[in-house]
Amino acid sequence: MVPAASALAGCSPSSPSVSVAYEQFRFTCCVNSESLTHAWHPGQSITLQWSTESAGMTADDAQHPITLMATVTGPYASVVALKASGAHATTLTASPIRVTDRTSGGVVSTIALPLDLAPGWYNLATTIQSAGSRTGGATIIEVTPPTS
């Protein structure tokens, strides 16, 4: 009977509590950025690969929403005109991707270039929205007429 009493003593309220930690992730775009610099043609699709990296551990068990967005605006007659933030005629938008800070895998955004898209210089912008803040980046792409 003595062993049972000692086993019960180990379960007393003075035992240490168990802590749980959750891994958080942050997103960046674009893993495939070097492939975005070639000339694009109407009818093609731009694929943006979002990647994740660990943002550390937390005891907070709540998942925090993150929205990943991408847009293409233009055309501009030149890179100088694009950088001057002049008016543009076209805005193409990828479907927003909704994830959380617990999403550990990469995701993909796609923007289809319409067949009637005018040639010129376009701004490809990416945005990460989380907890009321926004961060992002941009790159310049060129759309040229399709080759025969």
Where are these regions (language model features)?
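C-terminal motif of bacterial Sec signal peptides marking the signal peptidase cleavage site
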Residues: 7-10
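Contiguous segments within soluble domain cores/interaction surfaces
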Residues: 15-108
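Beta-strand-connecting loops/turns
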Residues: 43, 119-120
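Short, surface-exposed loop/turn segments at beta-strand-coil junctions that are enriched for proline
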Residues: 112-118
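A short tyrosine-centered beta-strand micro-motif
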Residues: 122-126
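Beta-strand-rich extracellular modules
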Residues: 127-131
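Short beta-strand elements
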Residues: 132-148
